[in-house]
Amino acid sequence: ITQRASLVQNLPIIGAMLAIMADVTTVRQIIEQDLLKIDIAAINHRRNTVVSGEKKAVEVLKELLEKQNIRTQYLTVSHAFHSRLMSPILEKFEQVARQINYQTPQIPLISNLTGDVATKEIATASYWCRHLLEPVRFLDSMNLLQEQGIKIFIEIGAKPILLGMGRQLPIHDGYWLPSLRPEQDDWLQLLESLATLYTAGVSIDWSAVEQDYASCRLPL
């Protein structure tokens, strides 16, 4: 991750990313009709598609979309991720990726590159090279989880970002839990999410939760 970030930061800052409140088919048709050098970067929702490309091309696309009353919003990013503008670092990134000793997942994992259950390919350098250039299929990934009956979603990160997109999907009676929140005590947030998991019937390893603290059980 750090090597990829370092390589990206050495790229010229000529790109932009734009969130579009339209389906991916509509967005792709407009891009192809106007021969714009723009790539689909993420498919987050049926009406939330992110594109990535050179700033001038993205500006042209934004104007075309606004004429059709399609809402858009620029993403606050340094570079045009998941696009052809990442190609200049592909060779060096592949060299780094080939040095890693990969292990195949021991638990089922959904690939946001394919939107399907990850295969052994995820433990290869070629997979992560594709991940650098190809779109994130968040919608397909979440749809698959819904088909499998998954209803508990925990975002592991410094702040909840994906939970907001997940809540827009038609997943009923779901639990959407952050691990951390800005301006919220870390331990308090973890305990709140643990409490929700417990009341939802999830088996909690309380010995692991309490291992760093002196405690005793009280009869209720």
Which stretches of residues belong to each language-model region?
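Acyltransferase
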Residues: 1-156, 160-162
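Flexible, low-complexity segments
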Residues: 20-21, 129-220
